[in-house]
Amino acid sequence: MPLLHPQSLRHPSFEIQTQRRSNSTTRLLLSHKFLHSQASIISISRTRILKRVSQNLSVAKAASAQASSSVGESVAQTSEKDVLKALSQIIDPDFGTDIVSCGFVKDLGINEALGEVSFRLELTTPACPVKDMFENKANEVVAALPWVKKVNVTMSAQPAKPIFAGQLPFGLSRISNIIAVSSCKGGVGKSTVAVNLAYTLAGMGARVGIFDADVYGPSLPTMVNPESRILEMNPEKKTIIPTEYMGVKLVSFGFAGQGRAIMRGPMVSGVINQLLTTTEWGELDYLVIDMPPGTGDIQLTLCQVAPLTAAVIVTTPQKLAFIDVAKGVRMFSKLKVPCVAVVENMCHFDADGKRYYPFGKGSGSEVVKQFGIPHLFDLPIRPTLSASGDSGTPEVVSDPLSDVARTFQDLGVCVVQQCAKIRQQVSTAVTYDKYLKAIRVKVPNSDEEFLLHPATVRRNDRSAQSVDEWTGEQKVLYGDVAEDIEPEDIRPMGNYAVSITWPDGFSQIAPYDQLEEIERLVDVPPLSPVEV
């Protein structure tokens, strides 16, 4: 039987059915593609929706985190303000300003979760006499905040650095304060005061050095007894390595070996300059210079080479000592070095329940009165004080609880406070107003300003050239001063006075305290624009 060709099997009805099936299959295929495309669209839309939702959630989370962060920062800022406000209640007695405004508060950290506050108080000197008060008060005021549970206070001091560090020799570039101890007369106990003051400052926590500037008669090798009594040289740096005793660095011509007994002035000045400027002093808070007696080349060299912060004047009750001291004070005033304290040595002794003044009294108080020096300290005739100078151990070290040691403690506090004030001083407070023809006075640490008549200021000079220092008799009479006199120059003298130069060449030292007591001008014409 012959095989039939497939086409022969086609029947119209079959073709129709096949076509129907084909159309149906096509429709099914189309429907499937449509559904698949719709599913893809739905899937894409769903993905986009999920992505959009995810983005929105991320934005929401970021916004929430930012809001939380802002709230956290706001709370932290509020907490920091609370702490600083509490600390601003503490006033520095020297500057008259709170410790926050002084810039003492450093490294403030707050942990709110634990209620813990940490900060550092950076004072101007490690020998600050009120550092314990600052620490206790800071703990107290911060702990009083309701959310604070623990307070951590760290005390520190500013790095040792002089005001004009860039203009100094390398050896002096890291010394904060240089104190001159001077008498301008030998044999009054100047070296004793210098050494005991230095070791008092060291006992208060300061880094201290002593420079014995007396080449002809050095006292330091006798008054202290270091293990190494010879100064060594650093061969690489060509600098002098100071010797040391009980933490205080020491330099003296007496430690330089056997030198010449006779030297001319220029040679001595060169030796002093070399010893002072090429020594590796390192970082010091205070360098105490034991000045040689007199007011000559050596003193001028020291004042020119070393930027003296302040001077301490040593005297005895005799009139002769007072005369030399007056010369020294005037020398320092011309060199713009403020004298911050007077030490009257060998002023009295106690015996049989009585106090005796074998050399009289009043010399130290006269210096304070005439020159406006703010502080006076008395030292008695005490055998142990002189004996300690011969034994090599200062009195303040061998007997720190003695009356003499307490006096030196008061002197040390005075020096620290006065040096801090001097370093904060910016400009003069006294000027001459040519339009009003009056001296305008603005006292430091005060908003008060007043005017003085120049002739009145000149007539109120209390120096030995105007007033006899013993009888009080006025040497310059009222008519000796012209009514229309005008000052030629007014310059500051440290933080306690000004130097006024008059047309006759006289240089008047006018302490601020004295200027405040002088009769003031009341009927002053109002200021008006001056035509140029």
Curated annotation (Swiss-Prot):
GO process annotations (BP): iron-sulfur cluster assembly
Cofactor(s) this protein cannot do without: [4Fe-4S] cluster
Keyword annotations: Acetylation, ATP-binding, Chloroplast, Iron, Iron-sulfur, Metal-binding, Nucleotide-binding, Plastid, Transit peptide
Positions bearing N-acetylalanine: A62
Cofactor note: Binds 1 [4Fe-4S] cluster.
Expression tissues: Expressed in aerial tissues exposed to light. Very low expression in roots.
CDD domains reported in the protein's UniProt record: Mrp_NBP35 (cd02037)
Listed result of changing C347S: Loss of iron-sulfur (Fe-S) binding
Residues that, per the record, bind ATP: C184, K185, G186, G187, V188, G189, K190, S191
Effect of mutating C128S: Loss of iron-sulfur (Fe-S) binding
Example GO molecular function: ATP-dependent FeS chaperone activity
Range of the transit peptide: 1-61
Observed phenotype of the null mutant: Seedling lethality when homozygous due to impaired photosystem I (PSI).
Keyword Ribonucleoprotein among UniProt keywords: no
GO cellular component labels: chloroplast; chloroplast stroma; cytosol
Gene3D superfamilies assigned to the protein according to its UniProt record, in alphabetical order: 3.30.2020.30, Fe-S cluster assembly (FSCA), P-loop containing nucleotide triphosphate hydrolases
Cellular localization per UniProt: Plastid, Chloroplast stroma
InterPro entries (alphabetical): FSCA_dom_sf (IPR034904), GBBH-like_N (IPR010376), GBBH-like_N_sf (IPR038492), MIP18-like (IPR002744), Mrp-like_CS (IPR000808), Mrp/NBP35_ATP-bd (IPR019591), NUBPL-like (IPR044304), P-loop_NTPase (IPR027417)
UniProt similarity note: Belongs to the Mrp/NBP35 ATP-binding proteins family.
PANTHER family to which the protein is assigned, alphabetical: IRON-SULFUR PROTEIN NUBPL
Function: Required for photosystem I (PSI) biosynthesis and assembly. May serve as a chloroplast scaffold protein that specifically assembles iron-sulfur (4Fe-4S) clusters and transfers them to the chloroplast PSI and ferredoxin-thioredoxin (FTR) complexes. Can assemble a 4Fe-4S cluster and transfer it to apoproteins in yeast cells. Probably not required for assembly or stability of plastidic 2Fe-2S clusters.
Name assigned to this protein: Fe-S cluster assembly factor HCF101, chloroplastic
Organism: Arabidopsis thaliana
Gene: HCF101
